[in-house]
Amino acid sequence: MAKSLTDSDDIGRFRSTLEATIASFGLERLSVAQVDQLVEHYGMLCKWNRHINLTRITRPDQAARLHYAESLFGGVLVGEARTLLDLGSGAGFPSVPLAVLRSDLQVMALEASQKKALFLTEVKEALGLSNFSVVRARIEDFDWKQYDLLTSRALDRAEEMLGPVATRLRPAQRLMLYCTPDLIEQLEAETAGGFKTEVHSIPQAESRVVALLSKP
């Protein structure tokens, strides 16, 4: 019989890798309840991924480091923001981990795909995330200016879509990108350096950063 993607060994490996990686990143330790919520999300991700393309990364150790711990790393940069909009949330990164981490933060996941939006809605219900909402829409059709913090981790046509967003930020609004340094350079070139950039290297990640963009 084929082994389940989320058998007890995989769940245990995911949990231990997540907790160890969070500690190695120097992040605040999650509560047992918070880790349980992320484990639940991981199990749903593996199950749904058999039917719709959510991610290529499902191995428990890789998913814990590259999806979950990386998403949580951005949590230290959220600051005093009270509302966050995840542009093209996909499987829920970074929106779901950030909603689990910060119960005081109202998180909206913006997703154009009907199937992925349905997955995120099921995640909200399963995890009991009262501070997490899902809207099915494209970035260009959605009024994002009401949010304190915009974020994106996996966007098709990233350079094409994020350039206009970066140039239209409100003075108090910030854009948090999980990306490579190359993307930041491309955005700076396309927008003639029309914003301030604060770049934080993600620990244990090759050429991956979290960048905060804001109006000068």
Map each language-model feature to its residues.
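Class I SAM-dependent transferase core
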Residues: 2-81, 85, 115-118, 122-130
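Hydrophobic alpha-helical segments in the ANL/AMP-binding
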Residues: 71, 96-99
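S-adenosylmethionine
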Residues: 95, 102-108, 112-216
